């Protein structure tokens, strides 16, 4: 969500404080440009499993050289709720794209689609940002009958996969072919 390009896994000894024990080992990995939280979590699980095995072998062999954790200010992640996972279409397109990837597969970024005076809750699963001039007011939906696009302040967002309330996830093409719509996000 915040544009980090690298992440990793750490093994450490537990002490009386949360996340303050001595570091045993660490492995880093690059966050891929189109990677969402679900895909990244799968990669980190595998990386973490390998690191746990290496750590246990080091402990068993008595070859552990720990380092203290850096003394940094504690930052608690906000609890994800419906109120703070709603898309803000007036944001920078790169921020919106990262927000969607960071909340995928759960809890999912969402928006409200307006269609002929009716508002529908809609989860957004996959988007692609196209930088350029602002075509319409941010949040306005436009289409060429093949792609569902939303105007943002510095270009447009292609909404590739979405899920209307009480429906299965679908591509934008499936939505455009299956529904009569006059949309606004």
Segments predicted by a language model, with ranges:
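Internal anion-binding site segments
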Residues: 71-185
């Amino acid at each position: 969500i915040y544009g980090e390009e690298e992440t990793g896994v750490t093994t450490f000894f537990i002490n009386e404080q949360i996340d303050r024990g001595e570091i045993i080992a660490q492995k880093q990995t690059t966050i891929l440009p189109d990677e969402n939280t679900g895909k990244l979590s799968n990669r980190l699980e595998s990386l973490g499993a390998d690191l746990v095995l290496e750590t246990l072998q080091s402990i068993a062999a008595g070859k552990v050289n720990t380092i203290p954790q850096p003394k940094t200010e504690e930052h608690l992640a906000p609890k994800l709720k419906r109120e703070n996972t709603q898309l803000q279409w007036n944001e920078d397109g790169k921020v919106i794209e990262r927000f969607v990837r960071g909340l995928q597969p759960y809890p999912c970024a969402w928006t409200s689609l307006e269609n002929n005076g009716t508002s529908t809750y809609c989860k957004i699963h996959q988007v692609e940002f196209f930088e350029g001039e602002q075509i319409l007011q941010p949040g306005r939906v436009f289409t060429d009958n093949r792609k569902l696009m939303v105007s943002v302040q510095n270009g447009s967002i292609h909404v590739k996969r979405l899920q209307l309330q009480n429906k299965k996830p679908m591509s934008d093409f499936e939505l455009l072919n299956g529904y009569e719509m006059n949309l606004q996000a």
